[in-house]
């Protein structure tokens, strides 16, 4: 795909398709991003132009649609990213739930990506429980994402050294992870309160239920 230029009309059609179908909004003049993200995918699919890709997508090729969304989804994430939201979760939200004697609180990570955010949330809950005599012991976290590739990574809960080095303290690594095959896996006590679901936020979300706290930091 790098062998040709994307026309303005082709880019606009692809831009509109992504926004309408899954809520991904590309900025203006991001042809280079489309080229870099889709190059290998289109080569393997024997697609040589963006117009050809759109023909396939409009024809209802669901496998190709999933692959395109996976390729175009931004997956930059880290453990306890920006710190403050997790401090607020710990010191404000969980304290409030504890004061109201809520043991079955529900949380939602609306775009969980490869799992770092949702497992960070679960670690905070686990640590809070250890300080508060098992308060919130029946709490659950729903983790959703539009990318099946990212959901599979998150479900596995297995991360390499380089991934663990992004925002995870040595103490939390020791407490919440265990060696697994060629990497490290989140321990069951943290994994067990999390359930995963593929979800397009452009579609109906009322059926997901009500939540005491929603993290949607990876959505924007």
Predicted regions and their residues:
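Conserved AdoMet
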Residues: 1-108
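Conserved class I S-adenosyl-L-methionine
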Residues: 102-120, 140-142
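Extended basic-aromatic, gly/pro-enriched interface segments that bind polyanionic ligands
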Residues: 110, 132-215, 219-220
